[in-house]
Every structure is written in structure tokens, then in C-alpha cells.
Curated annotation (Swiss-Prot):
This is RNA-directed RNA polymerase VP2. The lineage of its organism: Viruses, Riboviria, Orthornavirae, Duplornaviricota, Resentoviricetes. RNA-directed RNA polymerase that is involved in transcription and genome replication. Following infection, it catalyzes the synthesis of fully conservative plus strands. After core assembly, which consists in recruitment of one capped plus-strand for each genomic segments and polymerase complexes, the polymerase switches mode and catalyzes the synthesis of complementary minus-strands. One of its GO terms (cellular component) is viral nucleocapsid. Its main location: virion. Its EC number is 2.7.7.48. It is an enzyme of class 2 (transferase). It comes from Aquareovirus G (isolate American grass carp/USA/PB01-155/-).
């Protein structure tokens, strides 16, 4: 690649060498490369491709430049701009492959590029001209589709070429295999080069679009050429494919198949619609059709699901030796795929994939890597659709209920609800009884009579996110109610925080009109799925939804025991997926199509509201709930003797909830992508923005499956074998679901798989059953497991790489102007995705550093024309979790991607570098006059300062969002909104009294000199201020705040203090050494995660050394907490750490009670929790939190707990300095030292090794004293 290297400017050549491990990275090199990139024209990247002599069979036809006139794709209907399908598919409503050039007006700064002509937008807005409105819609939605990227794809392409330009240095590990595939054989790169020849004018390349901070600007071609928008999307997908192919070491044949699909999509009427139709091709040819030939073999784990199953704990008990008797029974998908591909003239791409697939008869590292690579071929583009079309298509659906509930099934009305008659049977009765019994349990549970638990429920939707605030205000204004305004507080007006403050002092009885307010549209773009419109409810609607959430949570936790919602995929029972996919088990993936639209008042919601209301009858009918008082309703169950009666606050909420569901919602649509598209749309679809949505769908999903397994299937299945299987099945043991997604686990049938005929009968029965109540079950039986977009095959997790595209990023709003430092967080998130997806780690690390270099530099021009520039040092990214490639004096690529971020990263680096920098310091700088607390007389701080370590360290902790400045808000308005939120929080006098008592008692105790337990603990009174701060941060920052951020960041970088945080200074007093590799936890021949194999050595070492985590991480970390739930705005882990801190500091029981009272807990609950706080029984992760040590997300799928317990040593006789041994009274110090040992070991590439504390500078006693001093000041 010498030609390519020579074509780079000198600063980028130096960066290329550093990324290869030839030379250490330093700030001078880093900043010069970043500066070069930011002044270098993007078109230069395509000239670099000229240096590669490609030799691939890829051909890009001229048909990709054909023009489907945009005028043929849009129309005005009912005064709305709507997309007209140009094919027979009704969902063909995505961006058309049309020429955009005729709509452009040249930019002054770049005349060859342009944006929408002002006259078109003016005619669309002012004259409402049909043609102009259609043109404007096409331009805006096409530009939005182009903008769904982290960065201009051209820049990402150049990062890749920088890696290719210099071969990587061998790291020295025996397993390092530096040979990578030749880039001249890359079909993706070759296709990019071919396409760009069309965009080459006068020897200069012009990308179809340039992505800028505010969106996209489009090339204005010379006469005779077009600029078809789909070519930009095609280039984005090809760049993404080229990166993934390099990072996975993908076979070029597979890359060719993907490139063919993308190119063919560009020749159709709509690129994105075609990709949506073809998204299932590559999974169908790989994970859904593996191992169907005779000769099946290999090894899989033997996993047991331990009792009780509700804990979701699993155990590896050995190896399953695979054979033909365990071969998958589900049919291959080849014929269906062939038919689909033939429709798009792509049938020939099937043969090479099938041929490669059939070579993998054994389940091993190579076969699962093949599966991972084929699945990665699916386009990872975020798909954009005109919001108007999302609403018209998604919110007009009505379920087809084959067996509706007859009017005779109901009693007379009880206010706004009806109860189900006793003689009704079938799934309706089963559903009704489940919800009624759960409601009874809630009504009788004294826990929910406690105001703090009620407010925990009521605080979960008080966030900085928007939620139909304007319609809330309008609905109340109509009734004559004037809401207070806090306009000068700078809190985002559309946020639910602002709404909560507005209604804080208004009785619920005056707010009921807001329950029927319109719901304002929001939008989400997704990968490989249609764009989704969201219905965010206002705070009053969310409040009356609380009983729905509460009862559903009870059903999920105590009755059906399904998984509950959460945002991190590793919280979603990964071990369950591995267990389910391991032969001889049979697993069926069950999804409910259009679940929101299928949950309507005609069936589900009328049953649920009636059942909850009846169940709540057992409670106190005069009791209020969440500030909602009891009320009087008319009970007409007896037509002859109707009567009025009092119902509780919970029942009153259900009355309003039932009326809200019965009326349906009016969806207020303001389509920012379509000029003039503002309309109100009635819908019966369940509101996707409700806090109840996920948990209520889960409860219904599991309840209906419960009836199927217990009653319906045994009555309708004919097969004796299947009847026997069903007799042992329950949802608690055999069905796990969340929302509309489920996994059905069929028990082993005498150590062999259930026959295909029996499976077909069962699945047909399930589909027919769903139609009786309006559900369409989308059933996938492929002998692989899929749950919540996670995949597993024969006990091996298969990362779905295409779901985390290196290039792609969602931008749902048409205004996408972001403040630059946010790109730093995008880099870090992008890096972590590659770690979790098991990319080839050294190449991924190189790519991450190239991206980090570009992102490290930013500029902002203020209104006076002054440009402010800031440049992050390279050590900033080390602190944020990207390991260095090469440090002075070390071997390249010795630091692992499993290195934690933050102070733990710095400890790991400095611990490993300690001896080298100490030696370098003594030969470079004079000794210190006074001994340093860690480095003795060596002036290591000056050396670290010269390396830029301190500058990068402190810059990393500088805010990357402009901080709301005091002068940007009126202090009186801030006080008013804070006071209103305080009243919203402490609405209950009992809760208010507890908090005040707790604060008073804590104040008395903390001021006691004899106790010396510190002065700061979490309190409910912190919450209003945190809400205000979050609301202000969500608002678009003023220019003055942006300028201040740039200036403040530059001050931090230029004049950093020559020390770390107090905690890190204490960490580095501990010297950790690594011993021999620990014994393997897993047979190295068993694939655990596709991509963690000898070709990708460090992840493989970590997985075989530690094994998969055997339990749900959510449950593991949840059970390590003394306090289960706290009010939104408080950090449950911070409360937990504060309790342990008090234990370490020897605080009396009264201090725990005061702290817990201060967060709203009663004396009885506080006493129970205080009694559980024990250092002896605390888990390592709990004590680690006290001093800010944590388990990073990259460890979450690994079984690190046994390693930390048995293979890290805070004291090793004969190895550890005796003064470093902690005394028995310092029992809490041992877990901290063990976590530091684990941090050091996991941060080194290679086998997982035992780790020991060699020495502690000063002694263990002095270190514990310093930690306690820090705790008092924290």
C-alpha cells in the first residue's frame, strides 16, 4: 500500500504509522492530523481510491443514476402531502430514487452544492402551492435520510484507508495473526470507486451530498447529469460494508453479495423500501438454515436452568457433543429466499452463500463466524419515512377479532367500566381473572399505601423529554384553568419536568380535562425496521395510567414471571437465550405483529379496566392514591336498582383510564418534513409513549400464552406426543417474553428433538388461537433463538453486527445541528459497540483512534464572527475507555479492549507502565525535594505532564455540553419552578414530614465531632434542583454558553493541574502484579460468542478464561442493592454506596435511619434496610461503588465474579509486602483491592491472569485511613 501511504499528507502519514503501532501517539502528532482533516477537502478521499488497483467482479450499472420523477411520487390528499406508492406494495412510502438537482439553489460558500431553493419553500409555506409542497417534502425527507449518519461517510471511508495504508505491527502475542485481506479485493471499495467516476468532473470528485452539522447539502451537477438521492444512500451502505468487512476479516465473496443487493436496490423505485423488503435474506440463508446436512457434529455447552427458574440463573455443567440426532429439524428457508431474490433479479447471489454454508457441517468457531459475517451483510441504515405516512399506515389499523366479546358477557356499567359475568369462559375469562387477582394483591399490599412508593411510581415520567405539553395546556385553558408559566427559568417548556411544575399545585379534580387532551406526535427512526411514530402522553395521562403499570408489573413479577423492561441488551437474560438455543431443546421465537394496534378497548382494554376496578374493590374505598382522591360513581349492575357509591383513588384512576381508552386518542400531527401537513388523526391504537406500554404488553403476552398452553392447545392438538409435551409446559418454565417479543421453550423429548410434523401442528394451532382475539402471531421456528434482537445458535451468542452500523446514527428531527463535543460521546459509544460485537479487536482499536482523532477538534463561530477552536488531547480518549495502541517503552497492542473507562483505565495504564516511567523519570528529571505519596523521589508528575496525560485527563471530565449559565435564567423564575417541583414531590404531608425529620436528624448527627461521618448524603430535597438542571440542559444552549464552554475547555487543557482525582491518587498507591494464567473456565473448542475465536485472540482468551455470565446481569446487580427503588432523580446506587460508606465510617443506626427518612422511607422500612447493611455480606460490586469502582459494560457478558473472588488476591503470602496486608477491621478494603487487581488484569491483552497486590505505598492501614478521609469529604 505504498502508493496509498504516499498520497496521504504528512500529518496523516504520521497518524497512519501511529495507528499501525510503528510509533507512539503524542499530542503534537494527534493535533496536526486533526487539524489537517478539518481543513482537507472531502473529495481528496476519493482520489486516494485511485491509488488502489482493484480486481473484483463488481459492476455498478448506469441504472442507479436513472430518475424516477419525484412528481409521480407525491400528491395532495385532504390537504396533506402524501407519498404515492409506485409499486404494488402499499408500504412503498419511503424516499423515492429521484433526482434532487432541479430543486437546488447554490450555496455562496460552495457553489457546486446547494439546498432547497428559497422560492420553493416560500411557495409551499405562504401560497400552499401543491407542487411546491410536494417538492419541499421530497427534499426534506431525502435530506433526512442522508443525515442518518454519525459523520459524513467520506470521512469514515478515509479513516479506513488510513488503516489500510500502513500494515499493522505484530504485537508479540503468539496468537496474533496480522495478515488481513487485500483492500484491492474489496467489492465495497471497488463499487465506491466505480460510482464516483460518474461524479468526477474536470478531474475532481463531487460526492452526491455533503453531510454538515445542519443536515445535507446536495451536488448541483452539470448539464447532462443527475443527482439521484439514492446514490448517496448507496455510498453510505458501501462505506459501512467496507468497514465491517475489514473489521470482521470477511470473505470477499460475502462482501460481493451484499454490494450486489445494495446496488440493485439503487436501481428500483425506492432504495430504502427495497432494503426493508430484503432485510430477512441474509439471516434466512445463515442462522435460520445452518447445519441441515448429515454429518452434524461439534461441541456445544450443556447448560442447566437452575431452580427456582424465576431467578434466571443458569449453570454450565459440561459439553454437549453434537450428532445427527440433534441436527436442526426446522426446514431451510432457501426456496422462499430464492423467490424473493428472483423478484429483484438477485437469485444468483444465493449460490455462493449456500455453498459456503454447506461446508460448515460442524458447529465450531468457523461456522459461527460465518453466520455472524453473513448476518452483518444486511444494510444497517436507519430508515426514514415521512411522518405523515407513518401515522396513516400505523395508526389506522384495526385488529380483526374472530371471537369478539358479546354484549351479554358484561354486567351493567359501574361508572365507566363493566365487569365480566361469572359464566363467561375462554381466554377472555383467563385474562380478566389474571388482572383482577393481581389488582386484589396490589390493593391489599400495604407497600403501596406508603406515599414514597406511590411517588416513585409517579416520578418515573418526570423527565426532560417532551410529552404533549402544548395540548395539555390547551385542554385546561378551555376549562378556564390558567397554568403558571416559568418562561424565564430556561427549563425546556415541552419537557415533562415543566409540565409537572405547572400542575403541581392544582388538585386532580381540576385536571381531568387533560386526560382527553390530544397527543402530540414524535418520531423514531430504526435500523432494519420501519420508522415509528410515538405517542408521548402528558403527565396527567401518565398519572392515570399508573394502576395499569402497577398491576402489569405485579403480573410479570409474581404471576407470569416474564422479563421486564430495560434499556441495556445485556440486561435481557442473555444466558436464557444460550440455554434455549442448545440442543436438544426446541425453541420458537414468537412475535405479535402490530402489537400496539392489537391492544384496543374492544377486547383487551375493556377487560383489563373492568378487572382492575373489580380487583381494587378489596381495598379501602376512601383511600386516595398518588394524590387522586376517592370519588362517587353510579353502579348500574342491577338495572332495577342502580345506586351511587364511593370508590377509592385507585378505582377513580381506572374510571378515567377506561374512559380515555374507550374514547381512543386524537393524534396531533405536525409533520416537520411536509410543509402544511398539520392535522388531527383519531386512533384506537394503544399509546406507545405510555409508561405502561412495555409492561402491559408483557403481561398480556404471557397471560394469553398461559391460556394457550394450559387450555387451548391440549384441547385442539391431536398428536399424542405433543399432548405429552404440553402437559409439562407452563409459562413460568417455558415462555419468556417482553412486550411483543417472546421465546417459547419446548422441553426435551427423550434427549432428541421434537418432530417437524408435531411442531407444525403446534404452531398452526397457536396462529389460529391468536386470531380469536385479534392477534397475528409472527412465529419463527428455525432452531436458533432470537429475543429482543439478540441471536444464539447452539448455545453461542451471534452478535447482530448490522444493528450497530459504524456509519449510521439516528436523527429523527429535521433540525440536526449538534454542539461539537457530542461527537466525542458518539466515538466512545461507537467503540463500545465494536467491543460488544466482537470485531477483530486490533483493527477496531485502530479505527476507533482514527475516528477519535477527527472528533477531537471542533470550532464554533459566534455572532461577532469570531471563531473559537478547541482540541482535545489524545489522553482524553484513554480516560474515556479507548486503550492506547503504543506507549513509550512498551510493545504495541498490549492493552485490551476490556479496559474499563475513567479512573480505572488510568490506574490500569499507570500500574502497567509504572516501572518504565519511574526509570525514565530518574534519567530525565532531577529528584524531588520531598517524597511523593506514590512515586517516592521520582518526579513522575512532570513526566506525565510532558506526555500530556494530565491535560487529557482533566479535559475528559470537562462538560461536553454547554452548562446552563446563571445569567441565562431569571433567579426568581428558577426559585418558583423549583418550589413548584418541591410541592409536586412532597404532595403528601406524611412524606414531607419524613423528609424534614430525616434532614433534621442528619444535620444533627453530621455536625457531631465525635462521630465524624461526613456531611453529604442523598436526599429527596436534591430532586427538584436536579429536575430543573436536567430541564435547562435539555433546552438548546444560548451562544454565550457555547463560547464559555470552548473557553473553559481550553483553559483546562492549557493549564492542567499536575495531579489526578483524590481517588485515583489513592488507587495508584496500590501496585498490582500479574501471575500465571488462570485455569480455563470453558472448553476452548466451544464457541461462546461468534467472533471470539483464535483469529480474534484477546476476546477469545477472555471468554475461555472466564466463561459467559450465568445469570441476568440486571438480576445480579439488582440483588447487590440494599435499596430497591428510589424516586426518579435520585441514584439508587449512590444511596446504596452512602449506606456502606456510613458502615465503613462506623456510623450509629440513627444515621442510617436519618438518611433513609431523608429519601422518603418510613421508620419501619428504614430499620429493616439498616439491619441488612453489612460489610461482611456485601458483594464486591457494592463496596466498589463506595469508592467509584464499577464493573464496565464490556465485562457484563463475562462471568467475572468467580474470577474476582478466587483469582485476585489482596494479600498473597510470600508475594505481597507484609505492610500491605489489611487488618480484619478493614474488611471493606479487600474488595476494593480485588477490584483494582481485576482492573489491571482485564486491561492487558492475552489470557486472563491471576493478579496480586504486591505493595501499597505507605501501608494498607494508611490507605484505608485515606479512603475514609475521602468518604467523609465526598
Amino acid at each position: 500500500m505504498e502508493d496509498l501511504f504516499n498520497a496521504l499528507p504528512q500529518p496523516l502519514q504520521q497518524l497512519s504509522l501511529a495507528l499501525a503501532g510503528e510509533i507512539p501517539l503524542n499530542d503534537e502528532l494527534f493535533q496536526a492530523a486533526a487539524s489537517t482533516w478539518h481543513t482537507r477537502q472531502r473529495s481528496e478521499t476519493y482520489h486516494l481510491l485511485d491509488r488502489l488497483r482493484f480486481s473484483t467482479p463488481i459492476v455498478t450499472p448506469q441504472a442507479i443514476y436513472r430518475d424516477l420523477p419525484w412528481r409521480n411520487c407525491y400528491r395532495i390528499n385532504q390537504d396533506r402531502v402524501e407519498r404515492i406508492p409506485t409499486t404494488n406494495a402499499s408500504d412503498d412510502v419511503y424516499v423515492p430514487n429521484s433526482d434532487i438537482s432541479t430543486l437546488l439553489s447554490p450555496l455562496f460558500s460552495i457553489p457546486t452544492y446547494g439546498t432547497l431553493h428559497p422560492s420553493i419553500e416560500k411557495d409551499a409555506l405562504e401560497l400552499r402551492a401543491d407542487s411546491a409542497r410536494c417538492a419541499s417534502t421530497f427534499y426534506k425527507i431525502a435530506s433526512s435520510q442522508a443525515r442518518q449518519v454519525k459523520l459524513d461517510p467520506t470521512r469514515m471511508l478515509e479513516f479506513l484507508l488510513l488503516l489500510v495504508a500502513t500494515p499493522r505491527v505484530n504485537s508479540g502475542l503468539d496468537t496474533d495473526q496480522p495478515s488481513m485481506r487485500d483492500p484491492t479485493k474489496s467489492p465495497a471499495l471497488h463499487a465506491i470507486w466505480q460510482i464516483m467516476q460518474y461524479y468526477k468532473v474536470d478531474s475532481k470528485y463531487h460526492a452526491p451530498a455533503l453531510i454538515v452539522s445542519t443536515g445535507a447539502v446536495w451536488w448541483i451537477p452539470p448539464p447532462g447529469k443527475r443527482n439521484v438521492v439514492s446514490v448517496q444512500y448507496l455510498l453510505t451502505d458501501l462505506v459501512n460494508l467496507a468497514i465491517i468487512a475489514r473489521m470482521t476479516d470477511m470473505h470477499p465473496t460475502l462482501g460481493l453479495c451484499a454490494a450486489r443487493v445494495y446496488i440493485q436496490a439503487a436501481t428500483t423505485d425506492s432504495y430504502t423500501h427495497t432494503l426493508l423488503k430484503l432485510k430477512g435474506v441474509f439471516p434466512a440463508l445463515s442462522i435460520h438454515s445452518m447445519y441441515r446436512q448429515k454429518g452434524f457434529g461439534g461441541k456445544a455447552p450443556d447448560i442447566q436452568w437452575t431452580e427456582p427458574r424465576t431467578k434466571y440463573q443458569f449453570k454450565w455443567v459440561g459439553v454437549t457433543h453434537l450428532h445427527d440426532g440433534l441436527r436442526p429439524r426446522a426446514p431451510v428457508r432457501d426456496e422462499a429466499v430464492r423467490k424473493l431474490l428472483t423478484e429483484y433479479q438477485l437469485a444468483d447471489i444465493m449460490a455462493p452463500i449456500v455453498e459456503m454454508r454447506n461446508q460448515h457441517k460442524h458447529h465450531d468457531h468457523d461456522s459461527v463466524r460465518f453466520v455472524r459475517d453473513v448476518m452483518a451483510l444486511t444494510s444497517g441504515m436507519y430508515l426514514v419515512r415521512q411522518p405523515t405516512m407513518s401515522v396513516l399506515q400505523e395508526y389506522s389499523q384495526v385488529p380483526d377479532i374472530k371471537q369478539p366479546i358479546p354484549p351479554s358477557a358484561w354486567t351493567g356499567t359501574v361508572g365507566n367500566v363493566r365487569y365480566l359475568n361469572k359464566d363467561v369462559t375462554g381466554p377472555a375469562r383467563w385474562l380478566y381473572n389474571t388482572w383482577r387477582e393481581a389488582a386484589q394483591e396490589i390493593a391489599q399490599d400495604r407497600t403501596w399505601h406508603d406515599p414514597v412508593n406511590q411517588f416513585i411510581m409517579g416520578s418515573q415520567y418526570v423527565t426532560a423529554r417532551g410529552g404533549s405539553g402544548s395540548s395539555l395546556k390547551h385542554s385546561l385553558t378551555v376549562t378556564g384553568l390558567v397554568l403558571p408559566e416559568f418562561s424565564e427559568s430556561s427549563v425546556k417548556r415541552s419537557s415533562k419536568i415543566y409540565q409537572a411544575a405547572q400542575i403541581a399545585r392544582i388538585p386532580f379534580t381540576l385536571l381531568t380535562a387533560a386526560i382527553h387532551a390530544e397527543v402530540v406526535m414524535a418520531i423514531r427512526n430504526q435500523v432494519q425496521r420501519r420508522a415509528r411514530s410515538i405517542m408521548p402522553l402528558n403527565v396527567v395521562q401518565q398519572a392515570v395510567s399508573a394502576p395499569h403499570t402497577l398491576v402489569a408489573n405485579y403480573i410479570n413479577k409474581h404471576m407470569n414471571m416474564s422479563t421486564t423492561s430495560g434499556s441495556v441488551v445485556t440486561d435481557k437474560v442473555v444466558p436464557l437465550l444460550l440455554y434455549a438455543s442448545t440442543p436438544p431443546r426446541t425453541v420458537v421465537n414468537v412475535d405479535i405483529k402490530a402489537c400496539d394496534a392489537s391492544i384496543t378497548y374492544d377486547y383487551f382494554l375493556s377487560l383489563i379496566c373492568g378487572a382492575m376496578h373489580e380487583g381494587f374493590e378489596v381495598g379501602d374505598n376512601h383511600a386516595s392514591f398518588m394524590g387522586v382522591p376517592s370519588s362517587i360513581i353510579m353502579d348500574k349492575r342491577s338495572a332495577l336498582a342502580p345506586y351511587s357509591r364511593t370508590v377509592s383513588g385507585l378505582q377513580t384512576m381506572v374510571q378515567h383510564l377506561s374512559q380515555m381508552y374507550a374514547n381512543g386518542f386524537r393524534y396531533s400531527v405536525t409533520d416537520a418534513f411536509s410543509s402544511g401537513n398539520k392535522f388531527s388523526f383519531p386512533t384506537s391504537t394503544f399509546p406507545s409513549g405510555s409508561t405502561a406500554t412495555s409492561t402491559e404488553h408483557t403481561a398480556n403476552n404471557s397471560t394469553m400464552m398461559s391460556y394457550f398452553l394450559a387450555v387451548h392447545a391440549p384441547q385442539h392438538i391431536k398428536s399424542p406426543n405433543m399432548k405429552r409435551v404440553l402437559s409439562d409446559m407452563t409459562i413460568q418454565r417455558n415462555y419468556v417474553c417482553q412486550g411483543d417479543d417472546g421465546v417459547l421453550l419446548l422441553p426435551d423429548e427423550a434427549a432428541s428433538k421434537i418432530s417437524a410434523e408435531d411442531m407444525d401442528e403446534l404452531l398452526t394451532c397457536l396462529k389460529d388461537y391468536g386470531t380469536s382475539f385479534g392477534w397475528v402471531y409472527d412465529i419463527d421456528w428455525s432452531d436458533s433463538a432470537e429475543y429482543l434482537k439478540l441471536f444464539a445458535l447452539c448455545g453461542c451468542r451471534v452478535p447482530n453486527v448490522s444493528r450497530h452500523p459504524p456509519v449510521g446514527k439516528e436523527y429523527a428531527s429535521p433540525t440536526t445541528d449538534e454542539i461539537w463535543p457530542s461527537l466525542i460521546d458518539i466515538v466512545v459509544g461507537h467503540h463500545l459497540n465494536g467491543v460488544m460485537d466482537l470485531m477483530n479487536w486490533r483493527e477496531w482499536l485502530r479505527f476507533s483512534w482514527a475516528f477519535a482523532c477527527y472528533a477531537s477538534r471542533g470550532a464554533y463561530t459566534d455572532k461577532y464572527g469570531e471563531t473559537h477552536i478547541a482540541q482535545y488531547p489524545w489522553w482524553t480518549f484513554v480516560y474515556l475507555g479507548i486503550p492506547p495502541i503504543l506507549l513509550p517503552g512498551q510493545t504495541p497492542f498490549i492493552h485490551s479492549l476490556f479496559m474499563p473507562p475513567g479512573d480505572q483505565a488510568m490506574f490500569a495504564i499507570l500500574n502497567n507502565w509504572r516501572d518504565l516511567i519511574s526509570t525514565n523519570t530518574t534519567t530525565t528529571f532531577p529528584p524531588l525535594k520531598h517524597p511523593h505519596h506514590t512515586w517516592h523521589l521520582a518526579d513522575v508528575p512532570t513526566l506525565l505532564d510532558s506526555y500530556g496525560v494530565y491535560a487529557g485527563y482533566h479535559a475528559a471530565q470537562h462538560p461536553r455540553r454547554p452548562v446552563a449559565q446563571p445569567e441565562t435564567a431569571n433567579s426568581e423564575s428558577i426559585e418558583q419552578i423549583t418550589g413548584a417541583l418541591t410541592d409536586y414531590l412532597l404532595y403528601d404531608p406524611i412524606l414531607k414530614a419524613r423528609v424534614n425529620t430525616g434532614r433534621h436528624n442528619w444535620s444533627q448527627l453530621s455536625q457531631s465531632i465525635g462521630l465524624n461521618i461526613g456531611g453529604r448524603v442523598p436526599s429527596l430535597m436534591d430532586v427538584p434542583g436536579k429536575w430543573v438542571a436536567a430541564g435547562r440542559e435539555a433546552e438548546k444552549p444560548p451562544p454565550s454558553a457555547i463560547v464559555y464552554m470552548f473557553k473553559s475547555l481550553n483553559r483546562t487543557i492549557r493549564r492542567p493541574s499536575k495531579h489526578f482525582s483524590k481517588l485515583l491518587e489513592l488507587y495508584i498507591r496500590v501496585k498490582v502484579v500479574l501471575g500465571a494464567p488462570k485455569p480455563l473456565a470453558i472448553d476452548p473448542d466451544i464457541p461462546q460468542v461468534a467472533g471470539a475465536d483464535p483469529h480474534n485472540d484477546d476476546p477469545w482468551f477472555k471468554y475461555v478464561g472466564l466463561g459467559d455470565i450465568p445469570t441476568s446481569t440486571r438480576r445480579y446487580f439488582g440483588e447487590s442493592l440494599f435499596v430497591g427503588r428510589v424516586v426518579s432523580g435520585l441514584d439508587v446506587e449512590a444511596v446504596d454506596a452512602a449506606l456502606l460508606r456510613l458502615k465503613i465510617l462506623g456510623a450509629p443506626p440513627a444515621a442510617y435511619i436519618a438518611l433513609l427518612n431523608g429519601i422518603g422511607m418510613s421508620n419501619s422500612e428504614a430499620n429493616q434496610i439498616a439491619g441488612r447493611v453489612s460489610l461482611a455480606n456485601a458483594q464486591t460490586v457494592q463496596i466498589g461503588r463506595v469508592v467509584n469502582l464499577s464493573t464496565p459494560s464490556s465485562w457484563m457478558t463475562l462471568d467475572t465474579a468467580p474470577y474476582i473472588q478466587y483469582h485476585t488476591y489482596d494479600f498473597k503470602p510470600g508475594v505481597t509486602n507484609p505492610s500491605a496486608q489489611s487488618r480484619e477491621k478493614f474488611i471493606w478494603l479487600s474488595p476494593i483491592l480485588k477490584l483494582l487487581c481485576a482492573t489491571a488484569a482485564m486491561s492487558i491483552a492475552g489470557p486472563v491472569r491471576e493478579a496480586y497486590v504486591l505493595d501499597i505505598h505507605g501501608s494498607a492501614a494508611s490507605l484505608s485511613g485515606n479512603f475514609r478521609e475521602w468518604m467523609r469529604a465526598a
